[in-house]
Amino acid sequence: MDLLGAHVSIAGGIHNAVDRGVSSGCDVIQIFTQNSNQWKGKAVSPADAQLFRDKLAASGLSHVMSHDIYLINLAAAPGEVKDKSLIAFKEEMQRCAALGIGKIVMHPGSHTGDGEDTGIRRICEAFDQLFGEVPQFTGKVLLENTAGQGTNLGYRFDHLKAIIEGSSYPTRFGVCFDTCHAFASGYPIADRDGYRRTFDEFDRALGIDKLMAFHLNDSKKGLGCKVDRHEHIGAGALGLEPFRFILNDPHFKLVPKFIETPKGDADEMDALNLKLLRSLIEG
């Protein structure tokens, strides 16, 4: 099993994500557990949770990962956005506990002009609160590296390191490495030398064992553009080589890898992008 998959929709019920993943040829899937553009999500009923768990067990999928909603900003100053963010992430943890999902990917957030150190401190404080409030979620939060747009945090590995080391729960974190975001933020992963230097830096900052998931996305824009625009595999500025490097790197053989590339009218592009990625695997 290649541990390749996609972000899939939960339209019509969260259990439908399993069928969509299987239909697209996924080994693993990533989902939103609620509408990603609304603050308030619906609690998962025991019946819905059991249906999801049963379908997942029968599906052959090996990993399911959740992604938090885009509105959440745990780096925000005290106020309405911070309060809503804490509630929304707490509810995300509760839903994942009910569904049996053990990993939540999240964007660290934006300091909105208050400075990187201040934003990182706020994130650490938020997670110290959240892990204490939701003991039933026993999984990990995967911090996703970002493209570096605006005042967003997470575009350097040192940001992720500071969050993990600044938390009272350092063992509850991992990292999700997004290829588009890394390239956009200035990591030169498109050639062999840059790839090696990037992951050597990651290992020095965080330890390679902290890398627990990949988002495999090509980039519409060039190196260091600070713009987050995903493209089909091999059709953007990254090309095919960095994906070939990752898929054949023995360090990452057991790390689940998810595409978040454009879907097409009926999600047909997921199967095509996954087929292309599998063609890059050697041996």
UniProtKB/Swiss-Prot annotation:
The record's section on PROSITE patterns has:
AP_NUCLEASE_F2_1 (PS00729), AP_NUCLEASE_F2_2 (PS00730), AP_NUCLEASE_F2_3 (PS00731), AP_NUCLEASE_F2_4 (PS51432)
User: Bound how, and how many: what does the cofactor note say?
Assistant: Binds 3 Zn(2+) ions.
Q: Which cofactor does it need?
A: Zn(2+)
Catalytic activity entry = Endonucleolytic cleavage to 5'-phosphooligonucleotide end-products
Enzyme class, spelled out = hydrolase
Keyword Nuclease included in the entry's annotation: yes
EC numbers, comma separated: 3.1.21.2
Where does the chain bind Zn(2+) 2?
144, 178, 215, 260
Kindly state which keywords UniProt assigns to this record, in alphabetical order. DNA damage, DNA repair, Endonuclease, Hydrolase, Metal-binding, Nuclease, Zinc
Q: Name the residues that bind Zn(2+) 1.
A: 67, 107, 144
Keyword Nuclease: yes or no?
Answer: yes
Cite a single GO BP annotation. Answer: base-excision repair
Q: Which GO terms describe its molecular function?
A: deoxyribonuclease IV (phage-T4-induced) activity; DNA binding; DNA-(apurinic or apyrimidinic site) endonuclease activity; phosphoric diester hydrolase activity; zinc ion binding
Binding residues for Zn(2+) 3, per the UniProt record?
181, 228, 230
Describe the function of this protein.
Endonuclease IV plays a role in DNA repair. It cleaves phosphodiester bonds at apurinic or apyrimidinic (AP) sites, generating a 3'-hydroxyl group and a 5'-terminal sugar phosphate.
Family designation: Belongs to the AP endonuclease 2 family.
Q: What is this protein called?
A: Probable endonuclease 4
Which gene carries the instructions for this protein?
nfo
